[in-house]
Curated annotation (Swiss-Prot):
This is FKBP-type peptidyl-prolyl cis-trans isomerase SlyD. One of its GO terms (cellular component) is cytosol. The lineage of its organism: Bacteria, Pseudomonadati, Pseudomonadota, Gammaproteobacteria, Vibrionales. Keywords: Chaperone, Cytoplasm, Isomerase, Metal-binding, Nickel, Rotamase. One of its GO terms (biological process) is protein refolding. The N-terminal region consists of two globular folded domains that contain prolyl isomerase and chaperone activities. The C-terminal region binds nickel ions. It comes from Vibrio cholerae serotype O1 (strain ATCC 39315 / El Tor Inaba N16961). InterPro entries: PPIase_dom_sf (IPR046357), PPIase_FKBP_dom (IPR001179), SlpA/SlyD-like_ins_sf (IPR048261).
Length: 201
């Protein structure tokens, strides 16, 4: 079976960024599963997977415009530290959900300067070319429920879980890893495929 819309593919992959650092991976024994054709992957990778079959192996470099976009300086802002209510000590690397006119977006603290904090709303891989080494482990037809919900229904795959205490903003895949932000929602903004799900951007 070929990878096409409404199929579920299982992938073993390694993701490296421009300096050669490995930022995410999954193995043949614990592959990443995702529903194809439902925006569960970054555009460039999903396009490369179209038509592949189990056993296919390839390496591809995805440009920023087909991954997480270029780094947008408009998403870097200096804000008063007191907007972070209920946090005893602000530190570089902390992540939060910020309420915006476009809805909540994840931001990361990149600088703490006295009573002011610099936050960055860019994805951590924005502006990066991403190189994937991929093996297609398996391909199957999606179930009706999976197609209706737009994601797979098994542990370890890409998509949303249904407990709404979590926010998903993963790397390549939706983000099934859960860190903690300070608004009561777990989130991961990981590499391409956070904790078992390669995902939407």
């Amino acid at each position: 079976m070929k990878i096409e819309k409404n199929t579920v593919a299982s992938l073993a992959y390694q993701l490296t960024i421009e300096d050669g650092v490995v930022v995410d991976q999954s193995t043949v024994d614990a592959p990443l599963d995702y529903l194809h054709g439902h925006n569960n992957l970054i555009t460039g990778l999903e396009r490369e997977l179209e038509g592949k079959v189990a056993g296919d192996k390839f390496t591809v470099t995805i440009a920023p415009e087909d991954a997480y976009g270029e780094h947008n300086e408009d998403l870097v802002q200096r804000v008063p530290a007191d907007v972070f209510q209920g946090v005893d000590e602000l530190e570089v690397g902390m992540r939060f959900l910020a309420d915006t006119d476009q809805g909540p977006i994840p931001v990361e603290i990149t600088e703490v300067d006295g009573d002011e904090v610099v936050v960055d709303g860019n994805h951590m891989l924005a502006g990066q070319s991403l190189t994937f080494t991929v093996e297609v482990v398996a391909v199957r037809a999606a179930t009706e429920d999976e197609i209706a919900h737009g994601h797979i229904h098994q542990a370890g795959g890409c998509g949303h879980d249904h407990d709404h205490d979590h926010d998903h903003e993963g790397g390549c895949c939706g983000g099934e890893g859960h860190g903690h932000d300070h608004h009561g929602h777990g989130k991961k903004e990981g590499g391409c495929c956070g904790g078992g799900g390669c995902g939407s951007h």
